[in-house]
């Protein structure tokens, strides 16, 4: 599965270190997520989807629809 996290980050001219800070993880670990060397934890996928304003499905490459799903509650 090809993640879109690198494209989303680069489209916003952000550095890996900046996104790693959002996730509260090390930059080298985040880099491994971008290169698909380690699986992206669901908690991080959810956090990144909220950060970028996209759905988790879009982030994971399962749909081409960027819009996030409406939140319940």
Annotate each PLM feature.
Residues 1-11:
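A short, Lys/Arg-rich alpha-helix, primarily the initiator
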Residues 10, 24, 35-37, 64:
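Residue-level detection of the helix-turn-helix DNA-binding "recognition helix"
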Residues 11, 50, 60-73:
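Short, charged recognition helix plus adjacent turn
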Residues 14-32:
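Short alpha-helical DNA-recognition segment
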Residues 24, 43-58:
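DNA major-groove recognition helix of helix-turn-helix/homeodomain DNA-binding modules
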């Amino acid at each position: 599965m090809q993640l879109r996290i690198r494209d989303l980050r680069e489209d916003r001219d952000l550095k890996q270190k900046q996104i790693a800070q959002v996730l509260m993880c090390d930059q080298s670990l985040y880099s491994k997520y971008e290169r698909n060397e380690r699986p992206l934890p669901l908690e991080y996928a959810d956090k990144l989807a909220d950060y970028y304003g996209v759905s988790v499905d879009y982030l994971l490459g399962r749909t081409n629809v960027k819009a996030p799903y409406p939140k319940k509650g």
